[in-house]
Amino acid sequence: MGITVRNLQKRFGDFTALDNVSLDFPPGELVALLGPSGCGKTTLLRVIAGLEHADAGQVVLQGLDVASVGARDRQVGFVFQHYALFRHMTVFENVAFGLRVKPRRERPSEAAIREKVHELLKLVQLDWLAQRYPSELSGGQRQRIALARALAVEPKVLLLDEPFGALDAKVRKELRGWLRRLHDDLHISTIFVTHDQEEALEVADRIVVLNRGHVEQVGSPQDVYDHPQSAFVYEFLGAANRLPGTVAGRGFVAEGAAAPTEVD
Protein backbone atom coordinates (compact mmCIF):
# COMPACT_ATOMS: atom_id res chain seq x y z
CA MET A 1 0.00 0.00 0.00
CA GLY A 2 1.32 3.44 -0.92
CA ILE A 3 1.20 6.20 1.70
CA THR A 4 1.10 9.93 1.08
CA VAL A 5 1.10 12.71 3.65
CA ARG A 6 0.44 16.28 2.57
CA ASN A 7 1.08 19.50 4.49
CA LEU A 8 0.78 17.88 7.92
CA GLN A 9 0.70 20.24 10.88
CA LYS A 10 0.66 19.10 14.50
CA ARG A 11 1.16 21.17 17.62
CA PHE A 12 1.19 20.27 21.30
CA GLY A 13 0.55 23.58 23.03
CA ASP A 14 3.36 25.91 21.99
CA PHE A 15 5.47 23.06 20.59
CA THR A 16 5.33 22.37 16.85
CA ALA A 17 5.86 18.64 16.28
CA LEU A 18 5.12 18.62 12.54
CA ASP A 19 5.47 21.73 10.40
CA ASN A 20 4.01 21.37 6.89
CA VAL A 21 5.37 17.84 6.31
CA SER A 22 4.74 16.28 2.88
CA LEU A 23 6.07 12.83 1.94
CA ASP A 24 5.37 9.90 -0.37
CA PHE A 25 6.02 6.30 0.72
CA PRO A 26 5.89 3.94 -2.30
CA PRO A 27 4.37 0.47 -1.80
CA GLY A 28 6.66 -2.24 -0.48
CA GLU A 29 9.49 -0.01 0.76
CA LEU A 30 11.21 -0.18 4.14
CA VAL A 31 11.58 3.46 5.18
CA ALA A 32 13.38 4.87 8.23
CA LEU A 33 12.25 8.08 9.92
CA LEU A 34 15.54 9.29 11.37
CA GLY A 35 16.22 12.21 13.66
CA PRO A 36 16.97 13.35 17.22
CA SER A 37 14.48 13.31 20.08
CA GLY A 38 11.70 15.83 19.54
CA CYS A 39 12.10 16.03 15.75
CA GLY A 40 8.57 14.76 15.04
CA LYS A 41 9.29 11.24 13.82
CA THR A 42 7.09 9.37 16.32
CA THR A 43 4.33 11.97 15.96
CA LEU A 44 4.36 11.42 12.19
CA LEU A 45 4.14 7.66 12.68
CA ARG A 46 1.21 8.02 15.09
CA VAL A 47 -0.64 10.39 12.75
CA ILE A 48 -0.30 7.86 9.91
CA ALA A 49 -1.61 5.14 12.22
CA GLY A 50 -4.55 7.25 13.40
CA LEU A 51 -3.33 7.31 17.01
CA GLU A 52 -2.91 11.10 16.76
CA HIS A 53 -4.94 13.55 14.68
CA ALA A 54 -3.14 16.23 12.69
CA ASP A 55 -4.23 19.83 13.13
CA ALA A 56 -4.08 20.25 9.34
CA GLY A 57 -3.08 18.26 6.27
CA GLN A 58 -3.90 14.89 4.75
CA VAL A 59 -2.96 11.25 5.21
CA VAL A 60 -3.75 9.20 2.10
CA LEU A 61 -3.59 5.40 2.20
CA GLN A 62 -3.98 3.63 -1.15
CA GLY A 63 -5.59 6.73 -2.66
CA LEU A 64 -8.06 7.25 0.21
CA ASP A 65 -7.95 10.26 2.55
CA VAL A 66 -8.24 8.60 5.97
CA ALA A 67 -8.78 11.74 8.08
CA SER A 68 -12.18 10.42 9.19
CA VAL A 69 -11.09 6.76 9.39
CA GLY A 70 -10.27 5.41 12.85
CA ALA A 71 -7.03 3.60 13.66
CA ARG A 72 -8.83 0.25 13.80
CA ASP A 73 -10.02 0.55 10.19
CA ARG A 74 -6.84 1.81 8.53
CA GLN A 75 -5.36 -1.69 8.00
CA VAL A 76 -2.20 -0.63 9.80
CA GLY A 77 -0.09 -2.76 12.15
CA PHE A 78 1.71 -0.86 14.91
CA VAL A 79 4.61 -2.10 17.06
CA PHE A 80 5.31 0.05 20.11
CA GLN A 81 8.79 0.74 21.46
CA HIS A 82 8.06 -1.10 24.71
CA TYR A 83 6.17 -3.97 23.06
CA ALA A 84 2.82 -3.46 24.91
CA LEU A 85 2.32 -7.22 25.23
CA PHE A 86 -0.47 -8.36 27.54
CA ARG A 87 1.26 -9.73 30.63
CA HIS A 88 -1.64 -11.99 31.64
CA MET A 89 -1.75 -13.69 28.22
CA THR A 90 0.52 -16.36 26.79
CA VAL A 91 2.54 -15.74 23.64
CA PHE A 92 -0.11 -17.62 21.64
CA GLU A 93 -2.93 -15.54 23.13
CA ASN A 94 -1.07 -12.28 22.50
CA VAL A 95 -0.61 -13.06 18.81
CA ALA A 96 -4.22 -14.26 18.49
CA PHE A 97 -5.67 -11.18 20.20
CA GLY A 98 -6.18 -9.01 17.10
CA LEU A 99 -7.99 -11.82 15.30
CA ARG A 100 -10.28 -12.63 18.23
CA VAL A 101 -11.47 -9.05 18.73
CA LYS A 102 -12.51 -8.58 15.11
CA PRO A 103 -16.23 -8.01 14.49
CA ARG A 104 -18.08 -11.32 14.39
CA ARG A 105 -18.72 -11.17 10.63
CA GLU A 106 -14.97 -10.73 9.97
CA ARG A 107 -13.60 -13.02 12.67
CA PRO A 108 -11.90 -16.23 11.51
CA SER A 109 -12.88 -19.56 12.98
CA GLU A 110 -10.96 -20.76 16.03
CA ALA A 111 -9.23 -23.37 13.87
CA ALA A 112 -8.16 -20.69 11.38
CA ILE A 113 -6.90 -18.51 14.24
CA ARG A 114 -4.79 -21.36 15.63
CA GLU A 115 -3.34 -22.06 12.20
CA LYS A 116 -2.53 -18.38 11.61
CA VAL A 117 -0.87 -17.93 15.00
CA HIS A 118 1.33 -21.00 14.59
CA GLU A 119 2.27 -19.83 11.09
CA LEU A 120 3.34 -16.42 12.44
CA LEU A 121 5.25 -17.89 15.37
CA LYS A 122 7.19 -20.04 12.92
CA LEU A 123 7.81 -16.95 10.79
CA VAL A 124 9.41 -15.13 13.74
CA GLN A 125 11.15 -18.39 14.77
CA LEU A 126 9.50 -18.59 18.20
CA ASP A 127 6.85 -21.29 17.78
CA TRP A 128 8.43 -23.21 20.68
CA LEU A 129 7.48 -20.38 23.08
CA ALA A 130 3.73 -20.40 22.36
CA GLN A 131 2.67 -21.21 25.94
CA ARG A 132 5.07 -18.89 27.75
CA TYR A 133 4.18 -15.51 29.23
CA PRO A 134 5.90 -12.21 28.33
CA SER A 135 7.72 -12.15 31.68
CA GLU A 136 9.46 -15.39 30.66
CA LEU A 137 10.87 -13.94 27.42
CA SER A 138 13.99 -11.98 26.60
CA GLY A 139 13.72 -8.46 25.19
CA GLY A 140 14.47 -9.66 21.68
CA GLN A 141 11.85 -12.40 21.93
CA ARG A 142 9.23 -9.95 23.17
CA GLN A 143 9.91 -7.67 20.24
CA ARG A 144 9.46 -10.48 17.74
CA ILE A 145 6.20 -11.53 19.42
CA ALA A 146 4.96 -7.93 19.23
CA LEU A 147 5.76 -7.96 15.52
CA ALA A 148 3.94 -11.28 15.02
CA ARG A 149 0.89 -9.82 16.79
CA ALA A 150 0.93 -6.80 14.47
CA LEU A 151 1.16 -9.06 11.41
CA ALA A 152 -1.69 -11.34 12.53
CA VAL A 153 -4.39 -8.99 11.23
CA GLU A 154 -2.68 -8.87 7.80
CA PRO A 155 -2.05 -5.11 7.74
CA LYS A 156 -1.34 -3.28 4.51
CA VAL A 157 1.20 -1.09 6.32
CA LEU A 158 3.53 -1.93 9.21
CA LEU A 159 4.64 0.89 11.53
CA LEU A 160 7.43 0.39 14.07
CA ASP A 161 8.24 2.94 16.78
CA GLU A 162 11.94 2.54 17.70
CA PRO A 163 11.52 -1.25 17.62
CA PHE A 164 15.01 -2.02 18.93
CA GLY A 165 15.56 0.97 21.20
CA ALA A 166 15.14 -0.96 24.47
CA LEU A 167 17.54 -3.77 23.51
CA ASP A 168 21.25 -4.17 24.10
CA ALA A 169 23.64 -3.49 21.22
CA LYS A 170 24.30 -7.13 20.25
CA VAL A 171 20.62 -8.14 20.17
CA ARG A 172 19.73 -4.91 18.37
CA LYS A 173 22.20 -5.66 15.59
CA GLU A 174 20.93 -9.23 15.19
CA LEU A 175 17.30 -8.11 14.99
CA ARG A 176 18.10 -5.42 12.42
CA GLY A 177 19.29 -8.08 10.00
CA TRP A 178 16.30 -10.26 10.85
CA LEU A 179 13.85 -7.42 10.17
CA ARG A 180 15.48 -6.71 6.81
CA ARG A 181 15.18 -10.38 5.78
CA LEU A 182 11.59 -10.56 7.01
CA HIS A 183 10.66 -7.48 5.01
CA ASP A 184 12.26 -8.93 1.88
CA ASP A 185 10.10 -12.04 2.33
CA LEU A 186 6.81 -10.22 3.03
CA HIS A 187 7.18 -7.08 0.86
CA ILE A 188 4.86 -5.14 3.17
CA SER A 189 5.11 -1.34 3.24
CA THR A 190 7.03 -0.61 6.44
CA ILE A 191 7.99 2.61 8.21
CA PHE A 192 10.17 2.53 11.30
CA VAL A 193 11.30 5.27 13.66
CA THR A 194 14.87 5.42 14.89
CA HIS A 195 17.42 7.87 16.24
CA ASP A 196 20.22 5.37 15.49
CA GLN A 197 22.04 6.45 12.33
CA GLU A 198 23.74 3.09 11.82
CA GLU A 199 20.41 1.28 12.12
CA ALA A 200 18.78 3.47 9.46
CA LEU A 201 21.73 3.21 7.07
CA GLU A 202 21.93 -0.57 7.41
CA VAL A 203 18.26 -1.54 7.23
CA ALA A 204 16.26 0.99 5.20
CA ASP A 205 15.58 1.30 1.48
CA ARG A 206 15.06 5.03 2.02
CA ILE A 207 15.72 7.43 4.87
CA VAL A 208 13.68 10.48 5.84
CA VAL A 209 15.76 12.81 8.01
CA LEU A 210 13.64 15.00 10.28
CA ASN A 211 14.61 17.99 12.41
CA ARG A 212 12.35 20.23 14.48
CA GLY A 213 9.24 19.11 12.65
CA HIS A 214 10.72 19.66 9.18
CA VAL A 215 11.93 17.18 6.54
CA GLU A 216 15.64 17.87 6.02
CA GLN A 217 16.31 15.23 3.35
CA VAL A 218 14.85 12.12 1.74
CA GLY A 219 16.94 9.57 -0.15
CA SER A 220 18.63 6.20 -0.22
CA PRO A 221 21.10 5.50 2.60
CA GLN A 222 24.00 6.06 0.20
CA ASP A 223 22.56 9.33 -1.15
CA VAL A 224 21.88 10.74 2.30
CA TYR A 225 25.32 9.74 3.58
CA ASP A 226 27.34 10.76 0.51
CA HIS A 227 25.36 13.87 -0.46
CA PRO A 228 23.90 15.56 2.65
CA GLN A 229 21.77 18.54 1.69
CA SER A 230 22.20 20.54 4.88
CA ALA A 231 24.67 21.10 7.70
CA PHE A 232 22.27 19.36 10.07
CA VAL A 233 22.21 16.15 7.99
CA TYR A 234 25.97 15.73 7.69
CA GLU A 235 26.53 16.57 11.35
CA PHE A 236 23.78 14.21 12.51
CA LEU A 237 24.94 11.27 10.38
CA GLY A 238 28.44 11.23 11.82
CA ALA A 239 31.69 13.03 12.47
CA ALA A 240 32.54 15.49 9.70
CA ASN A 241 35.08 18.20 9.00
CA ARG A 242 33.27 21.48 8.46
CA LEU A 243 35.04 24.32 6.65
CA PRO A 244 32.88 27.47 6.51
CA GLY A 245 33.42 29.67 3.50
CA THR A 246 32.09 30.85 0.17
CA VAL A 247 32.79 30.01 -3.45
CA ALA A 248 33.94 33.10 -5.35
CA GLY A 249 34.32 32.51 -9.08
CA ARG A 250 36.56 29.46 -9.27
CA GLY A 251 38.10 30.11 -5.89
CA PHE A 252 37.13 29.42 -2.28
CA VAL A 253 37.30 31.89 0.60
CA ALA A 254 37.63 30.21 3.99
CA GLU A 255 37.50 32.13 7.26
CA GLY A 256 38.26 35.37 5.45
CA ALA A 257 41.45 34.07 3.81
CA ALA A 258 41.51 33.76 0.03
CA ALA A 259 43.43 30.90 -1.55
CA PRO A 260 43.86 30.05 -5.26
CA THR A 261 41.90 26.80 -4.90
CA GLU A 262 40.39 25.46 -8.11
CA VAL A 263 36.73 24.40 -7.83
CA ASP A 264 35.29 22.03 -10.43
Curated annotation (Swiss-Prot):
The identity of this protein, by name, is: Sulfate/thiosulfate import ATP-binding protein CysA
Which species expresses this protein natively?
A: Burkholderia cepacia
ABC transporter domain span: 3-237
Chief location of this protein within or outside the cell = membrane
**Which InterPro entries does the UniProt record give?**
AAA+_ATPase, ABC_SmlMolc_Importer, ABC_transporter-like_ATP-bd, ABC_transporter-like_CS, P-loop_NTPase, Sulph_transpt1
Q: What does the function comment of this entry state?
A: Part of the ABC transporter complex CysAWTP involved in sulfate/thiosulfate import. Responsible for energy coupling to the transport system.
Q: Which UniProt keywords apply?
A: ATP-binding, Cell inner membrane, Cell membrane, Membrane, Nucleotide-binding, Sulfate transport, Translocase, Transport
Q: Which domain of life is it from?
A: Bacteria
Q: How does it sit in the membrane?
A: Peripheral membrane protein
Name the protein family.
Belongs to the ABC transporter superfamily. Sulfate/tungstate importer (TC 3.A.1.6) family.
Q: Under which EC number(s) is this enzyme classified?
A: 7.3.2.3
Q: Pfam families, per this entry? A: ABC_tran
Annotated residues for binding of ATP: 35-42
Catalytic function, reaction form: sulfate(out) + ATP + H2O = sulfate(in) + ADP + phosphate + H(+); thiosulfate(out) + ATP + H2O = thiosulfate(in) + ADP + phosphate + H(+)
**Molecular function GO labels:** ABC-type sulfate transporter activity; ABC-type thiosulfate transporter activity; ATP binding; ATP hydrolysis activity
